Amino acid sequence: MKENADRQYRQIVKYTGYFGGVQGLNILAALVRNKVVAVLLGPIGLGLISLYNTAVKLIGDTTNLGIPVSSVRYLSECQEEPDRCRMVATVRLWSLLTAALGAVVCCVLVPFFRLFYFSTEMSFAEFLWLVPVVALTAVTAGELSILKGLQRMREVATQSVVNAMLSLVVTLPLFWLLGNEGILPALVAAAVAASVTVLWFSLRVYPYRLPHSFRHAISAGGGMVRLGVAFVIAGAMGSGVEFAVRAFIANSGTLADVGLYNAGYVVTVTYASIVFMSMETEYFPRLSAVNHDEEACNATVNRQIEVSVLLLAPLLVAFMLLLPFVIHVLYSSMFLPALGMIRFGVVAMLLRAVMLPMEYMSLAKGRPWIYLLTEGVYDIAAVGVVVAGYSLWGIDGAGAGLLVAAVFNCVIDFVACRHYYRYRIAKKSVKMFSVQILPLVASYFVSVFCTGALQWVLGVALFGMSAAISYRVLERESGLMTAIINKFKRKHDEGIDSDSSL
């Protein structure tokens, strides 16, 4: 039992670091692309790219039926090879169907987008460039879900890096040669590159075959679609919350406040995604594979909470202290008024490390309506507290509202998981969170009330404390660093032996 726990710890740390590095490379590639595009195309070009990508995402998210998420759960449950082959074929069929649905919806919505979203100057033929982008995105997402569901994590990470680099290679020349006229061809080229990349890896695992019986495949995918639709609805509710908050700020405040709120939200969520990326990619399939075993399910959730908290806490302490510098790099000094909001958001991210592993339980167990219920209750509360916070204290108050909403979300998720799945949070998980929240909260007060050398001395001390705690616990539980050092020693010794034999 202890050996299995150590192995799980080592696996979580390994893949969190692995996919965190991948996410960091993706963020870096996006920054390079945005910088180059900003120089080549200017604000108008960036605005057009944003509008096109948002349109593609809106259509894709509402027509893919949540297959990219729900299929991971069903693939993870398949233990026998024939079952896996059938499920892979079913997922591919449903991906093609959602690709066709997305393409049709894209064509049907041309008048709507021309009138309300872009401008009447955009021709029907121009908008048709987005049709293959929507369809290829659905196919790509389906193939990627197959790799995730089969827990081919190395392939998932590798294709992500290759795709990020390939996207730069195929799009930047088009921007340079054609300017704004190259935006739509570049989007198609990027979609083709993404599809080719993921198919290169997925077809090596399972050659492309569709089900022999169309009717049976449609029936077999029913549960997958029901779970996926719940995920889509939850995503739509989340988008509705963000829209409602931004609309309230725009109407009761200023557009500048909306910009500050958006910048603060993006900075906080993007940074934390370096750790959270592994949740959907590695943790969700692993949890789905043991969803029928109550004890194993509880242990999996608790270990994920512990590792997420231990890995994220030192990063958040450092981020708290470096926030002014980060804002200057990513934006400009005009966005410094968002500092107060972001600081509250940073604390909320540690709570997110606790609630996300619990939220995946409903999806892993195939209980979509429980997931929808908890998300709906949270969304209503989030709108209320963020709006109230902004009304009382402006942008800083909106950040405080996000923190209160995160606390409420943790409580709701725990109550739901305890009631429906008999989840029991481990004392060790509570202890680790309690120990790591202290330096993070202390770093908040240091960043707000201290300046100059005192701020840096105290900040570095708090970071060192948090990092030391995390390292000690992770090394004790996983022995990962010892294993890495021993591996290098073995390679070094083998190299010496080979040299001596010569």
Cite the ranges covered by each PLM segment:
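Alpha-helical transmembrane segments of multi-pass membrane transport and lipid-handling proteins
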Residues: 92-119, 169, 176, 275, ...
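Transmembrane helical elements of multi-pass membrane transporters/channels
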Residues: 14-31, 163, 186-194, 198, ...
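Membrane-interface junctions at transmembrane-helix termini in multi-pass inner-membrane proteins
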Residues: 135-159, 346-378, 417-421
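Membrane-interface helix-loop junctions in multi-pass transport and translocation proteins
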Residues: 38-48, 150-154, 164-196, 366-369, ...
